[in-house]
Amino acid sequence: MLRPPNPLVTIVAALAGLNWLHARAVRWAIRRNLTRLWAGDPEPLLATYVDDVHFTFPGRSSWAGEFRGKEEVARWLRRFVRVGLRFEVHEILVVGRPWDATLCLWFTDRLTDADGGVVYENRGTIMAKLAWGKIVSYEVNEDTQKVAALDAYLAAHGVNTAAAG
């Protein structure tokens, strides 16, 4: 298991042109925080957001919207956890300097029923802007028709689909 790099070393390395070390630190933090999210704890991930974070989820589903600020994003993330969605990270790419970095995360998310059958699966990307290790803005892009079908499945099975956490 990778140990987290010292933040000061990461900044100095990035300033010296060692962007790979900065990228490694960001990838490590994202994986750690997503693992905590799946365990039901969104707080470590939320701690990496600026207070006025901007999150976009396109489409015409109950998940879609423009969310501004940690509280709005926190409600969305808590709902994600409450519904039981799981997220598999395939790749995390990070480019740029600590004060202006771009992150691209390629993932598959899915929901299984009580018998372990997959009832929803979708592949997508997250594009994010970061500054000094904090997420400033991000957008999730995946098949919006599959997300709408997830809404229908949840409603048909009596799962609370209210967007509020």
Model-found features: residue ranges?
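Hydrophobic pocket/interface hotspot
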Residues: 33, 44-46, 53, 69, ...
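Short, low-complexity N-terminal intrinsically disordered segments enriched in polar/charged residues
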Residues: 1-47, 156-165
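A short, polar/proline- and glycine-enriched secondary-structure boundary/capping micro-motif
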Residues: 66-67, 116-117, 146-154
